[in-house]
Amino acid sequence: MSLWISGIPIHYYLILAMIIFTIGVAGVMVRRSAVLIFMSVELILNSVNLVFVTFSKALYQVDGEVVVFFVMAIAAAEAAIGLAIVIAIHRIKKTSYVDEMNLMKW
């Protein structure tokens, strides 16, 4: 196993992925806007993609890079469906804050 990828130690990539993941989790926990929560979820998914690509390159395997393509496709579909739902709720409730979205009461 190579501990260097393109002249950069592997743990730098993992630390960067951990920082991005932490920022994403903090964004999900703190933000109230549904759009910003979706952006934070995308950060989390991209940090996982970075880990997949890092280990794929370090172990000279293609499996991690193939998984990244599937994760990116699923993330794009999730973002499109999620934003469509947020837009539909925004038209009804006139807000995109998740605290004020209560669909049980119209």
Swiss-Prot record:
InterPro entries on file: NADH_UbQ_OxRdtase_chain4L/K (IPR001133), NUOK/Mnh_C1-like (IPR039428)
Any Pfam family the entry gives: Oxidored_q2
Gene Ontology molecular function terms on file: NADH:ubiquinone reductase (non-electrogenic) activity; quinone binding
Major location category of this protein: membrane
Subcellular location: Cell inner membrane
GO biological process: ATP synthesis coupled electron transport
Membrane-protein topology: Multi-pass membrane protein
Known catalytic reactions: a quinone + NADH + 5 H(+)(in) = a quinol + NAD(+) + 4 H(+)(out)
Lineage: superkingdom: Bacteria
Any GO CC annotation of this UniProt entry: NADH dehydrogenase complex
Keywords: Cell inner membrane, Cell membrane, Membrane, NAD, Quinone, Translocase, Transmembrane, Transmembrane helix, Transport, Ubiquinone
Family in the record: Belongs to the complex I subunit 4L family.
Protein name (record): NADH-quinone oxidoreductase subunit K
